[in-house]
UniProtKB/Swiss-Prot annotation:
GO terms for biological process: purine ribonucleoside salvage; xanthine metabolic process; XMP salvage. This is Xanthine phosphoribosyltransferase. The gene is xpt. It is found in: Cytoplasm. Pathway: Purine metabolism; XMP biosynthesis via salvage pathway; XMP from xanthine: step 1/1. It is an enzyme of class 2 (transferase). It comes from Streptococcus pneumoniae (strain Taiwan19F-14).
Length: 193
């Protein structure tokens, strides 16, 4: 997605060897017009897949997921990373390791929001090692629902997340694919769209 790649080049900042900071439009401050375009692109791609729910993990996946769900006219569910006293029965959980934060969290979704009839599109901000998506898949499958596909805003193609998910049989669609960082610049791999 050229619009996204251009924004990454303009406002993204490389930290170290493998971290791209995009807090000015995705991971802290949100550019709603860009997120709306991202949501439209995902919705167009998956319009024929019969999606009934969009699922993400808090926090930075929420913006692209909500605009995708809006464009598909389906509910969006986000997995919570912190235990909540109001979520006390029928909770589906999985362990998720965060590459950026270097911590493992128990993420959860109330089981009442997913059913065996649901066809789910997972949307997330980044794909690195695939652990967030893997945790969401576990939760969705605990409910008996089906993961139709995984939509990623920014994929770190130099990490193994995509291979892990595709080898497990889950289609991955990434709007921007980072091949590497070179001389302080992002080098893109051809994106899926």
């Amino acid at each position: 997605m050229k619009l996204l790649e251009d924004r990454i080049l303009k406002d993204g900042h490389i930290l170290g060897d493998n971290i791209l900071k995009v807090d000015s439009f995705l991971t802290h401050q949100v550019d709603f017009s860009l997120m709306r375009e991202i949501g439209k692109v995902f919705a167009e791609k998956f319009a024929a897949a019969g999606i009934t729910k969009v699922v993400t993990i808090e926090a930075s996946g929420i913006a692209p997921a909500v605009f995708t769900a809006e464009a598909l006219n389906v509910p969006m569910i986000f997995a919570k990373k912190a235990k909540n006293i109001t979520m006390n029965e029928g909770i589906l959980t999985a362990q998720v390791y965060s590459f950026t934060k270097q911590v493992t969290s128990t993420v959860s979704i109330a089981g009442k929001f997913l059913s065996p009839e649901d066809k789910v599109l997972i949307i997330d901000d980044f794909l690195a090692n695939g652990q967030a998506a893997k945790g969401l898949i576990q939760i969705i499958e605990q409910a008996g629902a089906t993961v139709q596909a995984i939509g990623i805003v920014i994929e770190k193609s130099f990490q193994d997340g995509r291979d892990l998910l595709e080898k497990a049989g889950y289609p991955v669609l990434s709007l921007a694919r980072l091949d590497r960082f070179e001389n302080g610049q992002v080098v893109f791999k051809e994106a899926d769209l």
